[in-house]
Amino acid sequence: MSQIKIELIKSINDLNSRGLLLSSKWSSEQLNGLSPTILATPLTNEEQLSIISQPSISSPPIGSNEYYKYILAKNYFDLKEYRRCSDVLIDCNKYQLPIFLRSYATYLAIEKRREEDIIEQQAQQQQQQQQAQQQAQQAQQESQQNDKNNDTNNNNKTDQQQQQQQQQKIEQCQEFKQLFQFYKKLYIENKKDMDGFLLYFYSMLLKKQRDFTMARKVLIESVHKYPCNWSAWSDLSSLCSDSADIIMQLSLPDHFMKDFFLAHFKLELQQNNESLVIYQQLSRTLFTQSTYILAQTAIGNYNLRAYDIGEELFERLIELEPNRLENIDIYSNILYVRDKKASLSMLAHKAMKIEKYCPETCCIIGNYYSLKLEHDKAILYFQRALKLNDRYLSAWTLIGHEFLEIKNVSAAINAYRKAVDINPRDYRAWYGLGQTYQLLKLPLYSLYYFKKATTLRPYDPRMWCAAGGCYEFIERIPEAIKCYERAEENYDRERVAINKLAKLYQEIQNNEKAAFYYKKNLYYCDQEKIDGQEIIDALLFLANFYKNQNQTQSEQYCLRLLDYAGPEKEEAKSILREIHSKSKLSSKSKPK
């Protein structure tokens, strides 16, 4: 127990000293999430010494010249002056801590410049569009020669800007290649001496190079050498294929971090029940106060569509952390689905007070406007979220839904594709793509995306119903029936599958199966006191089906049909007359 506490304390220092702030935050949360008994137990002198001691190859000794340079560089890093940080450590090659910080600072500087270039390009495109509009308006008033001169000047400016951007891209690419070659050589020649952090950074470079197999191999080596780096585990999860079987083949360290990884990975794969079991075990034994586990458990219940439990857990989370915004956009999804306008309005106002310009806040407000059917305002806030973080998955998916609502299919497709690029495991984006192609009357495309969604979420009846609808549209009835049966096996709350199965079996004249599903649907409708055309269809079919088998039952269905107006009522009367005439004939034919 105390060993876990020591490892977490040590990891906070190690991660923070390398600028891995998200991982450091995660370790801090788990440290504070330990049970009160473990936290209250004081550390011995030996344990305190083990926390501050570092391997000789890792950190420069206090008082050395490299240590002074590292302290200065770390301050530059914290102030996001990544180039200055890298410059200070340019000659520090003896210890692994300054090597990592220099490399990471260089990497972040390249990424920062890339993001700035994207913003500049977008601004230039907007400026060019505005200039084109202005020129079109002035074309009627100005002479043709002036127009030609203006076009030439604008084209020259555009060419110069493009040349500058191209030169910057080449320089960034060369810098990245140098960084990659340095780590590749280091790994080949000196892999045994590389610590877990240098291995983790090398895996980041491999991911950028799209060498995912090698990146996964290096990450496994990294978590073996240093298990308490959550970013390494998180990256490993993203590099594993969409099957839990691959985890069994990986050689992972026997460590408490492995349980967190497995729970996270299974949640990503929509194996929600298995994930929740692991989180429950962790929260019962060690991490009884972990808000991270509480949030993940709430998300798991949201994925399972247990919205009441998910809402309760999120409310408990907000009580513990009133100013928390992380994951609270998922809570807003629950309030949206449950049609709780007042609660969602209060949450949106609260989020605005906590942090106005935050992706989560923008998504919460977007959900609020979407619930009010103000789709233009919802789109505006989701776009703001994406300006703040262009890799914010929820915003891409939600803005796709909004574009779909206003029938802007091309924009919806673009948004869903962005979501899939960020996370290929996002079933909502695949499902959304299927819906967009349904609107375009392209059932084969739609079917492809719905099948992707069923692969990612095989226990969700909505995915199977959507795939079944496509098969039905292209008249592949046996495949449609199989999809609807899968939906029915997985508790189709909306009862779409039962109704469809009854009608499809009726269509192919398998009347016994049709009667089975019509009776089942009728039972649920009676239980929920639902009335409508599906009740009439079920009663009429069952009345006809049983008139030659069980006249009493057929009579009961006919009597219920008499309560409805329309042609079905007359047909019920006709069936009743037929039943009565048959019963009279049978009674006359009996021997006296």
Curated annotation (Swiss-Prot):
Pfam families referenced in this protein's UniProt entry, alphabetically: ANAPC8, TPR_11, TPR_8
Listed name of the protein: Anaphase-promoting complex subunit 8
Protein family membership: Belongs to the APC8/CDC23 family.
Entry's localization field: Nucleus
Keyword presence, Acyltransferase: no
Cellular component terms (Gene Ontology): anaphase-promoting complex
Transmembrane segments: none
Highest taxon in the source lineage: Eukaryota
Chief place of localization: nucleus
Keywords, alphabetical: Cell cycle, Cell division, Mitosis, Nucleus, Repeat, TPR repeat, Ubl conjugation pathway
Alphabetized PANTHER family for the sequence: CELL DIVISION CYCLE 16,23,27 (PTHR12558), CELL DIVISION CYCLE PROTEIN 23 HOMOLOG (PTHR12558:SF10)
The keyword Cell division is assigned to this record: yes
SUPFAM superfamilies (UniProt xref): TPR-like
Pathway recorded for this protein: Protein modification; protein ubiquitination
GO biological process, one term: protein ubiquitination
SMART domains: TPR
Organism name: Dictyostelium discoideum
